[in-house]
A protein has these predicted regions:
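Rossmann-like dinucleotide/phosphate-binding beta-alpha-beta segment
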Residues: 93-153
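Short, small-residue-biased leader/transition segments that mark boundaries at the very start
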Residues: 1-6
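C-terminal helix-to-coil terminal segments
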Residues: 224-269
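Short, acidic/turn-prone active-site loops that include or flank metal/cofactor-
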Residues: 19-21, 68-72, 126-129, 252-253
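A glycine-rich phosphate/pyrophosphate-binding beta-strand-loop-alpha-helix module
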Residues: 9-46, 50
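Short, structured coil segments at secondary-structure junctions
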Residues: 9, 39, 59-61, 117, ...
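Anion-binding alpha/beta catalytic cores of soluble intermediary-metabolism enzymes, centered on
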Residues: 41-113, 209
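Rossmann-like adenosine-cofactor binding region
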Residues: 141-237
Length: 269
């Protein structure tokens, strides 16, 4: 999708995969950043540690875009907020419920974004999966200035009452040990987004997911989960995913528009 966005804007793209890059191995991140900054007009990093993309940005001398790290996913946030505006008309005051594992890039980024935009963010999950306290405290400080609220709860009925948006992300990833899958699935089963989760939400409430989603048996992971745990759906049911509240494909399209806008804004004189 990113390569398509670049080409659509009349630019040229070079892709460096992990096996083709010596970043942080044979060559330090500051050195790599300065070399790439002499060769390219912009750099997108999609990888692991947040500190890597921040160090690239410090030394590159050209725009550096965070395509995703373990901690944050800012380009997805622009797409998500655009999608909410398209369907609900405004952002400020929106009650946004995130169900599932809220410890990583999506939970973190959505909480920060909601805090900055005056939205009411609710992380609804097993307390083991709450965002880290330091980030929660930061978001509460921001929320005090914007009129936002930050709530952490394990009560689905309370969390989803009058919700405008219910959002989730995958619980498991390829390559993780089976025992990790088992623990996470067991802990997060009560926080599956299903029709019951929408019973207390507003009639206009929408369902969002950054994709990919495990809502049926048409994927390798979906089949593996069914064989090992007997579940045909994970973080969201097929009924919700394919239902009238779901805006996930508008959301996916909006990543393209958002990435183009970010590139134009940061590369323009």
């Amino acid at each position: 999708q990113r390569q398509m966005c670049i080409r659509d804007r009349g630019m040229h793209v070079t892709y460096l995969d992990p096996s083709g890059s010596q970043i942080g191995k044979k060559e330090s991140i500051p050195d790599t950043a300065r070399v790439l900054g002499r060769m390219f007009d912009g750099i997108e990093y999609r990888g692991y540690g947040q500190e890597i993309v921040e160090e690239l940005a410090k030394y590159a001398g050209v725009p550096v875009w965070n395509g995703l790290t373990n901690e944050f996913h800012p380009t997805q946030m622009i797409a998500d907020m655009l999608t909410i505006r398209e369907h609900l008309g405004e952002l400020k005051g929106v009650k946004f419920v995130y169900m599932g594992d809220a410890r990583y890039n999506m939970g973190n980024s959505l909480m920060v974004t909601c805090a900055k935009l005056g939205m009411h963010f609710v992380a609804c999950t097993n307390p083991k999966y709450y965002p880290n306290k330091e980030l929660v405290d930061y978001c509460k400080d921001v929320a005090a200035q914007t009129g936002a609220t930050i709530t952490l709860t394990d009560d689905v009925a309370e969390a989803t009452k009058d919700a405008d948006v219910i959002y989730t992300d995958v619980w498991v990833s390829m390559g993780e040990p089976e025992e990790v899958w088992a623990e996470r699935i067991n802990d997060l089963k009560p926080y599956q987004v299903n029709t019951k989760a929408f019973e207390n939400a507003k009639d206009s409430a929408i369902f969002m997911h950054c994709l990919p989603a495990f809502h049926d048996l048409k994927t390798t992971i979906g089949k593996q989960v069914y064989e090992k745990f007997g579940l045909s759906e994970l973080e969201v049911t097929d009924e919700v995913f394919e239902g009238p509240r779901s805006v996930v494909f508008d959301e996916a399209e909006n990543r393209m528009h958002s990435i183009k806008a970010i590139m134009k804004a940061t590369l323009s004189d």
